[in-house]
UniProtKB/Swiss-Prot annotation:
GTP hydrolase that promotes the GTP-dependent binding of aminoacyl-tRNA to the A-site of ribosomes during protein biosynthesis. Residues 136-139 are annotated as: G4. Gene3D superfamilies: P-loop containing nucleotide triphosphate hydrolases, Translation factors. It comes from Histophilus somni (strain 2336). PANTHER family: ELONGATION FACTOR TU, MITOCHONDRIAL, ELONGATION FACTOR TU-RELATED. Residues 60-64 are annotated as: G2. Belongs to the TRAFAC class translation factor GTPase superfamily. Classic translation factor GTPase family. EF-Tu/EF-1A subfamily. One of its GO terms (cellular component) is cytosol. This is Elongation factor Tu. Residues 174-176 are annotated as: G5. Residues 10-204 form the tr-type G domain. It catalyses: GTP + H2O = GDP + phosphate + H(+).
Amino acid sequence: MSKEKFERTKPHVNVGTIGHVDHGKTTLTAAITTVLSKHFGGAARAFDQIDNAPEEKARGITINTSHVEYDTATRHYAHVDCPGHADYVKNMITGAAQMDGAILVVAATDGPMPQTREHILLGRQVGVPYIIVFLNKCDMVDDEELLELVEMEVRELLSQYDFPGDDTPIVRGSALQALNGVAEWEEKILELASHLDNYIPEPERAIDQPFLLPIEDVFSISGRGTVVTGRVERGIIRTGEEVEIVGIKETTKTTVTGVEMFRKLLDEGRAGENIGALLRGTKREEIERGQVLAKPGSITPHTDFESEVYVLSKEEGGRHTPFFKGYRPQFYFRTTDVTGTIELPEGVEMVMPGDNIKMTVSLIHPIAMDQGLRFAIREGGRTVGAGVVAKIIK
């Protein structure tokens, strides 16, 4: 096949490999880039190029992550792979690499293992919306019944964590054989690619989502009124539109009478832009940093939620000692810190630096939130943990 020209116009989708250590995540990542580059152009990446993952910092946390890119006929994919289990945990919780879908790698020779379960659970907690399964090392299993058994176990495990186990695509393959260029196993990589294209819907772009702007600063401009500034997180705001001010205090409504950027007046502000919004009839003291401007009805304020949290290790600049129930740190959402108390799961007395843990948080002020919102845990301005809202309680 002739190599297709790389089209910037293709929809962009973020995916990643998850699964138990040594089940073949990195080999599969290499195989995907190699097979797809033959068919659709792009660069093949060798195993050791991917395995040698560079260190990154996300919210002050060190994570080793490899990013590769590949194309199918209809889409462009950015794919993240992590060398170690701890890196996955950190990656999923911080949202350093947001995934529109994940490829769960399970070795047919082992079946589901403890980290298989943990990655599925994390996927549920942090809001990975779709999982596709690659049953790896199938060239080493001759027994059809055994393969069916492993498949059944994986489907049951997915269903247990509220993924549609019965409808999840499962590809039986061998990443190593595909990487080595064996045609029948290369075919399985193409099968996987077609599931990526068809099973994972195209993500909604930030600009198409309801308007939201986290407020960073508030100014009073004499003769004109109150201006709030910040970066538009999603959506578009047009002059004359009604917005809600959500979080910390009672929700109120106001109208945006002007949008400006670099001291120029505009008709609208869009996702990704730093803007000032002039608000009608709103007093300077009624608004504060930490609130958000949002499309009316699109987001609500909450104080109590379940979360999945990663606690920084001492080496990452976190705490040197464990914390216990009754711990009262600050929770940093978007632009501000709010104090909160925590509840640990049944039977857990203390949490060590470097652990990841499910905890229930109760904030002293409500914050505009929805499921999947990321936050940092801080003590006196120092980050000691990272978390994600898994479920809103009230």
